[in-house]
Protein backbone atom coordinates (compact mmCIF):
# COMPACT_ATOMS: atom_id res chain seq x y z
CA UNK A 1 0.00 0.00 0.00
CA UNK A 2 1.17 3.51 -0.74
CA UNK A 3 0.98 5.98 2.11
CA UNK A 4 1.89 9.68 1.92
CA UNK A 5 4.90 10.28 4.10
CA UNK A 6 5.07 13.13 6.58
CA UNK A 7 8.56 14.13 5.47
CA UNK A 8 7.86 15.27 1.93
CA UNK A 9 8.98 12.07 0.26
CA UNK A 10 6.97 9.24 -1.21
CA UNK A 11 6.87 6.17 0.97
CA UNK A 12 6.25 2.90 -0.83
CA UNK A 13 5.32 0.10 1.50
Swiss-Prot record:
Annotated keywords: Allergen
Tissue: Expressed in seeds but not in fruit pulp.
Sequence similarity: Belongs to the 11S seed storage protein (globulins) family.
Protein name: Allergen Act d 12
Species this chain originates from: Actinidia deliciosa (Kiwi)
Amino acid sequence: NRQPSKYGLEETI
